[in-house]
């Protein structure tokens, strides 16, 4: 690991422990040249499937797109950032566990709606209105009636 102080390429690990939540390893390192200490965080490189768009294009999965879309649906709602992060964590885990190399946006959208349904029904309807591209008020009303039945 390159030292951030002198750019020397060798360092020794002085201390190693799990990071908060256990998703990473926090390591305290000491440069073998200048002797200064610095911290690194190591994470497992996750392989997530490609997202297949409605027009057939394929894009790498981007966590921030999910976070931004859910935050937009939850705007001015009593949904904490922590709750949104946990939702996205569950969705990423589901993606990994699916074992699929590609996932259609339709499937991903349904998963997001399922998560939102259990958290905030107004956010659910907001997301559904964009995701399902309602063409008129009748389609919107049908979604609301389905929501009330659940």
Swiss-Prot record:
Residues 49-139 form the ATP-cone domain. InterPro entries: ATP-cone_dom, NrdR-like_N, RNR_NrdR-like. One of its GO terms (biological process) is negative regulation of DNA-templated transcription. Binds 1 zinc ion. Signal peptide: none annotated. NCBIfam families: transcriptional regulator NrdR (TIGR00244). This is Transcriptional repressor NrdR. One of its GO terms (molecular function) is zinc ion binding. PANTHER family: TRANSCRIPTIONAL REPRESSOR NRDR (PTHR30455:SF2). A zinc finger (unnamed) spans 3-34. Its cofactor is Zn(2+). The gene is nrdR. Belongs to the NrdR family. Keywords: ATP-binding, DNA-binding, Metal-binding, Nucleotide-binding, Repressor, Transcription, Transcription regulation, Zinc, Zinc-finger. Negatively regulates transcription of bacterial ribonucleotide reductase nrd genes and operons by binding to NrdR-boxes. The keyword Transcription applies.
């Amino acid at each position: 690991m390159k030292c951030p102080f002198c750019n020397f390429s060798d360092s020794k690990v002085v201390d190693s422990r799990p990071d908060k939540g256990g998703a990473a390893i926090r390591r305290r390192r000491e440069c073998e040249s200048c002797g200064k200490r610095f911290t690194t965080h190591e994470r497992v490189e996750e392989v997530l499937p490609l997202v297949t768009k409605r027009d057939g294009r394929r894009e790498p999965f981007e966590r921030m797109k999910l976070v931004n879309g859910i935050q937009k649906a939850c705007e001015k709602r009593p949904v904490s950032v922590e709750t949104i992060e946990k939702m996205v964590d569950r969705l990423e885990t589901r993606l990994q566990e699916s074992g699929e190399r590609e996932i259609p946006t339709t499937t991903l959208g349904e998963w997001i709606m399922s998560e939102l349904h259990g958290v905030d029904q107004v956010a659910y309807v907001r997301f559904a209105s964009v995701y399902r591209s309602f063409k008129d008020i009748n389609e919107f009303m049908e979604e609301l009636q389905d929501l009330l039945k659940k």
